[in-house]
């Protein structure tokens, strides 16, 4: 299943680059988990992008339901760990985005990109 996720992440990374974003890291891991894509947009905002790749017929609204409050907490903790390890990005504003990718018959496409899908306040 990792292969499917990798393909979805590649689609999103390529799309972000067309939006003039700089990819800072992909599949960055720490004890809290993995950050799929970390990018910086043209305005200097650091984007922590969670990518969910699903087939056309799925049970969790194209992966959106998989971004539970518990998952959001882990992503926030991982983002904090990334920023601690990369001090040059600590003063930049940050955003948590979700990218939903669909695949069907070997074709992958970005179905929906949710900018600022959740915030620190949304999980309290």
From Swiss-Prot:
One Pfam family matching this protein: UPF0102
GO molecular function, one term: nucleic acid binding
Gene3D superfamilies attached to this UniProt entry: 3.40.1350.10
Matches recorded under InterPro entries: Restrct_endonuc-II-like (IPR011335), tRNA_endonuc-like_dom_sf (IPR011856), UPF0102_YraN-like (IPR003509)
Family designation: Belongs to the UPF0102 family.
PANTHER family cross-referenced by the UniProt entry: UPF0102 PROTEIN YRAN
Xref: HAMAP family: UPF0102
Protein name listed in UniProt: UPF0102 protein tll1737
């Amino acid at each position: 299943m990792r292969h499917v996720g990798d393909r979805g992440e590649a689609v999103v990374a390529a799309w972000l680059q067309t939006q003039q974003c700089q990819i800072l890291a992909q599949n960055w891991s720490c004890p809290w988990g993995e950050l799929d894509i970390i990018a910086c947009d043209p305005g200097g905002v650091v984007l922590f992008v969670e990518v969910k790749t699903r087939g056309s017929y799925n049970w969790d609204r194209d992966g959106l339901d998989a971004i539970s409050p518990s998952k959001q907490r882990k992503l926030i903790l991982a983002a904090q760990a990334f920023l601690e390890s990369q001090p040059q990005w600590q003063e930049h504003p940050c955003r948590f985005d979700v990218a939903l990718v669909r695949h069907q018959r070997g074709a992958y496409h970005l179905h929906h990109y949710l900018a600022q899908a959740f915030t620190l306040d949304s999980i309290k």
